[in-house]
Amino acid sequence: MSGNDARARVRSLPSTSSPLETRDSDEQESSSSQSQRGSRKRGPQRRATELPSAADLYVPSLPGLPDMATHPTHPLNIYAGMLPSYPGEGKVGGEGETGKDAKLYFLMAKARRNAGKERVIFWFNGGPGCSSFDGSLMEVGPFRTVPASETTTGMVEAKLVEGGWEEFATVVFVDQPPGTGYSYAATNGYLHDFDELSAHFIEFLQNFYTVFPELKGVDTYLAGESFAGQYIPFFADALINSAELPNFPLKGIAIGNGWIDPKEQYPGYVEFAYEKGLIDSGTPVSAAFVDLHKERADQMLTDQEAEEMEAALKRCQEEMDKYTDPFTTPVNIDHCGEVMDSVTRPFTQELNGKKVCMNVYDVRLVDDFPACGMNWPPDLPDVYTFLRQDEVISALHASSKETAWVECNNKVSYELNLKHSHMSAALLPSILEAGVPILMFAGAEDLICNYKGIERIVNGLEWGGEKGFANATSQEWYLNGTQVGTWQTSRGLSYAKIFDSSHMVGFDVPHVTNDMIMRFMDVDVSLLPGMISQWSSRIGDDERTMIHVGDAGEAGGVPLIKGGNTDWEAWYNAVFAFLVLGILVSIVGLYFYFRRKPVSYRSRIALKQRGRHRQSHDRDEGDTAERMPLGSERLELDDIERAEGYEFDDRDDEGYSGKGKGKGKELADDREEVMFALGDDDEDDRH
């Protein structure tokens, strides 16, 4: 198998071998010839002369959210639009037609609370060529979509959800490289290598800080998933060594289920398959897999299938052995795509008259063949519809993009041929040695960029005079008393394995990833006076509290809405102090008043409960898709997520290209099967 990816799709591209791919794009643009490359040195940057103002980019409302800034429980300030990224003629990323007139699109959610200081996170999805709206609408952002069937307008609308990373940091979701999502690239202007992408990101940042100067100098983090495991280290290296943005306040990078080091991750497929029991020569499918896929309980994985997998790995290893220098090791290695194919092939079969296959992003699920995960996650059809509605396009200042939004643009992926690029893993030691912490996190149920491959990377990495985590042990990670994963840290590098989660961890367990990023950024919630309702988070002996995100009215505390505005904080603090003083005065008054009453009368007096702590199971109906159970209860998918979805060919006229836009179906029970339950994993997953 060959191709690139990040949110990872399974499709073939010529001349590369990767476990990754991208969704087909409906954008029809003529192929561009490879442009001549001039000097690779980056010279002084050409500054953009015409930029929009912050006011021009403000997004006051979206369908379903008429006035986000004054929302009663979750006020939100959103900015969105395009900014130039073309670094200038003759510069890296600007040779010939390459990158000419390119613009990168972004959506920024300002921080809702300020715990001591401001923080900014730039988020990237992978692909290459996959839009960061995956992140903002389905993972770590403040929004989820509401199906048209559930709205009074008959349109797909947006709703606000808790657990987003904008709770304590301003999050900027960037569509890049140019041409991705709402971003713009001229027909012959697509980028080809990572140094070009870095140059465009640096130029974008300079323009971004011109429009939002208050964010320049703020502690900054880069984060993303999948193929962003290639982008992010290159961007970090460029910022550390940038002449255009000297002393850049880069405080860390976070990569989820990233494609980083092919030499470690291709063998990781085989280790993952054996550990999960997906391939166990001569024995039935593992008990865990049988529980989720009862119809397959009688299938035997033969010795021959295991031998084919080992043979594929051997052929791959012969190719990998040709590369001994990480700075010449390519992102994808020929003949190695066969390794993952050999793992998934036995799970492609006829079932109830339909050909199905494993969902490579969540091995607990299956999907219609040949989608194998492309029909997932279940929100995707509504995301497509939402981002193609005229009202949304106008509100998000995306009208200048002539072609319709697509999740992943194949033209971007194809043109990014990486002929002059090496794997990003080569840069990790120098990033760590520059004092920039790195967090790698992995959903335990993802195959395509699985945790075994990530663990091989961190265990083989050498920096600071030592290899891997040395003597640092893996510690259990608990949220409200439930183990949600494991965490390991040494010399600036952290690795988090997250249970019950897929390739898109934030989609499955948003509150866990919220706790994770708060820990990584060292957010101190004790600096939020008046925040009464809290959750506990513990890694080993390190126990902390995190703000309980929920309905402030039901929580019985002060409103949990601060947005980082010091005037609002002062107002809330004053109100809180006034209320406490009033309650104390009332209690003292009642005490002296009732001392003069008969005891029998006093015994009937009790202070009325003003509210209740809202537990994780106290949810509004319909919220379960976005809310992670933090106790022992199970989280079931609602009827919408259980729906069959669209068939492969029923949306071609809308640009879906016959790929299908539904959910990878669980086979155990169409309506009653549990998607995941914290505390119910196999024991093997917890070590």
UniProtKB/Swiss-Prot annotation:
Q: Region (Disordered): which ranges? A: 1-55, 610-671
Q: Per the record, where are the segments of Basic and acidic residues compositional bias?
A: 617-626, 633-645
Cytoplasmic topology: which positions? 595-687
| Reactions listed under catalytic activity | Preferential release of a C-terminal arginine or lysine residue
Provide an example Pfam family for this protein: Peptidase_S10
Molecular function in Gene Ontology: serine-type carboxypeptidase activity
Recorded GO cellular component terms are: membrane; trans-Golgi network
Recorded E.C. number(s)?
3.4.16.6
- Function description: Protease with a carboxypeptidase B-like function involved in the C-terminal processing of the lysine and arginine residues from protein precursors. Promotes cell fusion and is involved in the programmed cell death.
Its protein name is: Pheromone-processing carboxypeptidase KEX1
- UniProt organism field: Cryptococcus gattii serotype B (strain WM276 / ATCC MYA-4071) (Filobasidiella gattii)
Its ancestry begins with: Eukaryota, Fungi, Dikarya, Basidiomycota, Agaricomycotina
Task: Give the gene symbol.
Answer: KEX1
